Amino acid sequence: MPRENATASHAESSQVPKPWDDFDGLGHYYQYRPEYPSAVAEQLRVMLGNWTGGTVIEVGAGTGLFTRSVATALGPTYRIVALEPNKDMRRHAASQTPAGMPVTYMDGIAENLAVADHSAQLLTAASAVHRFNRSQFYQEAERVLIAGGILAMVQYKPFDRGSAFADDFLSVIEGALPTYRRHRHSKPEGGYSEIDISGELKGLSTFQGVQRGAFVHHEQIDLETFMYRALSFTIIQKAMIATDRSHVMAQLFEIFDRHADQKRLVAMPYEAEIVTARRVDHALKS
């Protein structure tokens, strides 16, 4: 059984709200979230081609959706340390990860990684980096990655280009949250903003070879999957708090009914974006 290590790198007992508090009680809904396209983890496997094994650090692992995808692609020669500060998420991750996968789930945060210096070939975060203090996270990435090691950040979002259903779904959120606009992300301190991960990494002297890729995944889903998947998004939870839960739920039911086919399925497209960079080998540059 995958291990869950509760060793804390932050004060969980603090009463000050933390960005990960938003995920309390949402672990159950994550089983309805879409899988990450296998091509994303496969890209990382190819990029790690110079090594035959090693250590992967994942930050903000949630319920382990991306963790398991990476573990499957890389195989047993890579040990994955999956850090997740929300206890409910860690519990679901450990329970859903097959026995024998070389994964350890631990309490930990992006800004203070409980990882030895220069110990990892890959540091990754999936659907989480927008909640980090990224300047501190990038400093930690430089510290924990070996020379030539890979920093990879993945974002997964509804793809509204050419999809009336995805457009209507995002419009429900925009109508409930005046400061939210599609393609914006939650900020750690609250509110929403657009982020440019590629641009941020290109501005750092400690990383080079910044690349961006995108994979669009289309999926036919039924009403139950759609509703539970919607409830797994903190942005939907905030929309229900800002307006009225029953009103938001009624809107979601309505757009599903409007777009469902004869089999009571809707096409929900998602885009997975991956941005990668390599830690500079200063010895080679000098």
Please identify what each model-predicted range represents.
Residues 3, 190-286:
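Conserved Class I S-adenosyl-L-methionine
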